[in-house]
């Protein structure tokens, strides 16, 4: 990984899941790192797990706070002097159908999942443009390709990330900054367990969602991170992670108005007890 090994990478949401796996693989490849997460304990665990003789800085950060992201970018540049890769990975989930969640719930998720990405690009782009080669990776989701029941806020945020990233790629085409949008399929992380329960969603929604998530997550965070870094080295504009994501992408293209009929049974069927 020639590009990655010679650079300075910023990874948000690095306290667990894909973000932690990315930090570990980047450090092992020789990349300097600035890792951030709102979870201070998780961030410390990630930092302690990193291997490699590389410069590392840790930053407790709420990506929904614009002023905090601006200060974060300034701090990273002051410490590392340059940035070549930014991975906007931080994200949260919300359980409940649209009528079961409050507008405050909806805004909370959008502020993290969408505006956190926008802020990350806005305040790191100037330093990225100063490098001979640089890369922005924005993490969307397979739910930025299709829109399942019970994911109104999450899908809205991930479709927004997808659209924003595609526009950004077109606007930066021909420059030194390449842009990739990542669409992970089912990844084994703690996002479902940590999801916020909608204001009016029944308590059983969490148990059902976690059981469904466990059944539909064939890919590991480590596999996801490796695929993302492969896509960065290859300068891929769209990075689909997992066979499930590739299948859903094809299905949506073939049946854009009726794909949910094909997906609903698989996604919504109850977990079978042994």
What are these regions (language model features)?
Residues 99, 146-153:
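Active-site loop immediately N-terminal to the catalytic Tyr-X3-Lys motif
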Residues 141:
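Residue(s) in the substrate-gating loop at a strand-loop-helix junction
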Residues 97-98, 102-107:
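Substrate-binding pocket helix/loop in short-chain dehydrogenase/reductase
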Residues 121, 157:
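Active-site helix of classical SDR
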Residues 8, 15-16:
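Conserved glycine-rich cofactor-binding loop
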Residues 174-243:
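SDR active-site lid
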């Amino acid at each position: 990984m020639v590009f990655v090994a010679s650079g300075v990478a910023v990874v948000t949401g690095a306290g667990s899941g894909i973000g932690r796996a990315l930090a570990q693989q980047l450090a092992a490849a020789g990349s300097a790192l600035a890792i951030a997460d709102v979870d201070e304990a998780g961030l410390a665990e990630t930092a302690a797990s990193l291997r490699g003789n590389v410069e590392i800085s840790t930053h407790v950060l709420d990506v929904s706070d614009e002023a905090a992201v601006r200060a974060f970018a300034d701090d990273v540049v002051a410490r590392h002097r340059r940035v070549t890769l930014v991975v906007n990975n931080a994200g949260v989930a919300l359980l409940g159908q649209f009528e079961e969640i409050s507008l405050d719930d909806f805004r909370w998720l959008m502020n993290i999942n969408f505006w956190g990405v926008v802020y990350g690009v806005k305040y790191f782009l100037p330093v990225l443009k100063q490098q001979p080669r640089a890369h922005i990776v924005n993490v969307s989701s397979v739910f930025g390709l299709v829109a399942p029941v019970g994911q109104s806020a999450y899908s809205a945020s991930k479709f927004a990330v997808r659209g924003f990233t595609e526009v950004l790629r077109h606007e930066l085409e021909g420059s030194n900054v390449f842009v990739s949008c990542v669409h992970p399929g089912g990844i084994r992380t703690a996002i479902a367990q940590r999801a916020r329960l909608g204001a009016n969603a029944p308590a059983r929604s969490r148990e059902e969602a976690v059981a469904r998530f466990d059944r539909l997550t064939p890919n590991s965070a480590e596999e996801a991170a490796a695929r993302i870094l492969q896509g960065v080295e290859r300068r891929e504009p769209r990075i689909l992670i997992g066979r499930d994501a590739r299948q859903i992408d094809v299905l949506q293209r073939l049946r854009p108005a009726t794909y949910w009929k094909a997906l609903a049974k698989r996604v919504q069927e109850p977990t079978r007890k042994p």
